Amino acid sequence: MNEKSLRVLEYNKIIDLLKKKASSSLGLKYIENLVPNTDFVEVKSMLEETSEAQSIIIKRGSVGLEGIHDIEDKVKRAYIGASLDPGSLIMIADTLRVARRLRNSLSSSDEEDFNYPIIQSLSNSLYVYKDIEDQIYNAIISEVEISDNASSILRDIRRRIAQKNQSIRSKLNSIISSTTYQKYLQDAIISLRGDRFVVPVKSEYRSQVAGIVHDQSSSGATLFIEPMTIVEMNNELRQLKLGEQEEIERILSELSAMVGEVSEDLISNQEILGRLDFAFSKGKLSIQMRGIEPTLNEDKYLNIKNGRHPLLDKKKVVANTIYLGRDFHTLVITGPNTGGKTVTIKTVGLFALMTQSGLHIPADYGSSMCVYDNVFADIGDEQSIEQSLSTFSSHMTNIVSILQNVTADSLVIFDELGAGTDPVEGAALAIAVLEDINSVGAKCIATTHYSELKNYALTKSGVENAAVEFDIETLSPTYKLLIGVPGKSNAFEISRKLGLSDYVISRAKEYINTENIALEDVLQNVEKNRIKAVEDREEAERLKEEIEKLKVEYDEKLEKLVSQRDKMIEKAKSEAFSIIRQAKEEVDIIIKELRSLEQERASKEKNRKIEELRKELTSSMGSLQPTVKSMIVPKVSNKEIKDLKPGEEVKVITLNQNGSVVSVDKKRKEAVVQIGIMKMTLPFKSLQKTRKDVSTNVTKSTRNIIRSKSGSVKNEVDLRGLNLEEAIMEVEKYLDDAYVAGLESVTVIHGIGTGVLKAGLQDILRRNRHVKSQRGGQYGEGGAGVTIVKLK
């Protein structure tokens, strides 16, 4: 990749931002070596790696990379047999712990959507040596301290050292506290010189205290003497400390040997940990920049949606949409100074470099980038004092180099192409340069002040105009890029706003070529029409948003109403079902009493009693009818009934039950329907004709009803295919009929299925007043798919 382009596009500043996200020197090595890649497959993989890291950070927060150290040199020393110091071993243990935890947390997860093949492939490659990790932590407390737990020998030596120290101190305390020695001592204290215990003796009493002089004070007034009585004890202490040091060296050597045995795996871990740190650094930077993974295309076009320059303040930067490479290969941008032209072209160039480095770009989802073989940029004033080159010469030297190396797969960026020389010649050179680049097929973005380039873009195929917007009212740029609109000079308008007289402005216009004036007028009209179109589009979008909002509110209210309706229907059905069951229980009692009375001899008193019970039954059914009717939410039949006759069989849609028509009111379009022994007045629209008609004489006595039932009621009922609620309604109606018909035993067919229907029905049968007993079907009766019921 062109080094000059990397510099002028400030690629190094992106690298500096990335470095701040690294957790270790291993990750920094990868970042420092990062350069844009030109291989499509590799770039795609690099971008996916960044996306995986970004997603994991968002889900998990901290990844746990803290504690990684660069241990390669230490591991290599252990491999050749060197003994490592405690600090080095602690660093190795820390790095092993990070590797183990990363492998455990990234390789497997209980989260269903935790699927990150690139990151997980890296973490799965990490070697785990928890035994080495544990032994190092068990043996070493810090960089300067070995634990007593390192070995039983070390623990014993240190115990003996402590005892010997105590013995020496006790002996010295007895010396310094004795009246004999007190006058010889400078202070009643015990000191150490080297690793020998001494007492401070006044120099004039040197001959009075037998011992070895180890030191003296700066004034010479005090001598530090090791009394002869403890010399042997100090020697023993010295021997113990030498033994301690030997044991420590043995322990460190043993731990170092363990590290050396797995040195290749640990060095492999270093590479993987560095790669993971690098990947998560990219993920962190993406989150900071609110970056996205651009779609990568092989057609050499870019489409940046609301791209934001990554080095500018996120709160102030203006997002711009930029596209290049499909309908046109060259984009010519015009507009005022400080209007954002340079920032715009730098954004495009930097996005290309970032994408090819596997970094996310701060833009909206749906942005698309491609892989260029090179990115060339000529931006800024880089005149060379050493080479005595002018601004124009400096730019032209760079442009010559670009033209010599550009290919069809390159991206070229020019800032103020042709500037720094005579405007006429500069414009001509600029057009010629763009022609040459366009003929090669490279993609190019150029900024300019020359109106000749605007005319060139208007007439040349494959070249498009663009402008940075300028607000005449505020005399300030808006930094918005408008592709397809050539930039307009605002010198006259700005001058008028600043107070320049119309006379001077008119005189100035006389010195301009009439063609240029006409072009400026056209551009002014285009700009007015564009602003009007933008306003109309914004108004249309506002209205669309309001309509969408109203639609959402309507859908929410409709959903709420439907939910309320369904709840009301379910509640009504439940209450109706409860009322019907209660009524049936009352009817059962009355029928039972009627049958009991009919078995006795008739008498006036008994006949009167029967008549009262029949009236009570009629009253009960009559009071029940409007209650149930009012609670049932009407359902309309698919086929409207125009005419009904008494005796016809109909289906009551609201109850999902069949009944017989007793009487008909054609004017009100209502019919009295008998369902079992219950009568209800229902509208035609809630009824549906069935194929089978039955004749029912509603004036028959209870005895005749019982006799007619006995001939028509079957000794079995098939409930298969019904849900539990429907089955309960059906079986209770059937048991009423069977009981009235005088059947002694019936078969309830429910099937095997999941067992829910069978269990629910058997529970209802246990509580039914007509049921004497029940049992499961036997072989030949239907087996587990039926229940045999004995009636009272």
From Swiss-Prot:
Residues annotated as binding ATP: 335-342
EC assignment: 3.1.-.-, 3.6.4.-
A family per Pfam: MSSS
UniProt xrefs under SUPFAM superfamilies: DNA repair protein MutS, domain III, P-loop containing nucleoside triphosphate hydrolases, SMR domain-like
GO biological process terms on file: mismatch repair; negative regulation of DNA recombination; rescue of stalled ribosome
Domain of life where this protein originates: Bacteria
Keywords attached to this entry: ATP-binding, DNA-binding, Endonuclease, Hydrolase, Nuclease, Nucleotide-binding, RNA-binding, rRNA-binding
GO molecular function: ATP binding; ATP hydrolysis activity; ATP-dependent DNA damage sensor activity; endonuclease activity; mismatched DNA binding; ribosomal large subunit binding; rRNA binding
Broad EC category: hydrolase
Chain ranges of the Smr domain: 717-792
SMART domains: MUTSac (SM00534), MUTSd (SM00533), SMR (SM00463)
HAMAP family (UniProt xref): MutS2 (MF_00092)
Family membership noted in the UniProt record: Belongs to the DNA mismatch repair MutS family. MutS2 subfamily.
Function: Endonuclease that is involved in the suppression of homologous recombination and thus may have a key role in the control of bacterial genetic diversity. Acts as a ribosome collision sensor, splitting the ribosome into its 2 subunits. Detects stalled/collided 70S ribosomes which it binds and splits by an ATP-hydrolysis driven conformational change. Acts upstream of the ribosome quality control system (RQC), a ribosome-associated complex that mediates the extraction of incompletely synthesized nascent chains from stalled ribosomes and their subsequent degradation. Probably generates substrates for RQC.
PANTHER family xrefs: OS10G0509000 PROTEIN (PTHR48466:SF2), OS10G0509000 PROTEIN-RELATED (PTHR48466)
Subunit relationships: Homodimer. Binds to stalled ribosomes, contacting rRNA.
Official protein name in the record: Endonuclease MutS2
Species whose genome carries this gene: Clostridioides difficile (strain 630) (Peptoclostridium difficile)
Organism taxonomic ancestry: Bacteria, Bacillati, Bacillota, Clostridia, Peptostreptococcales
Gene label: mutS2
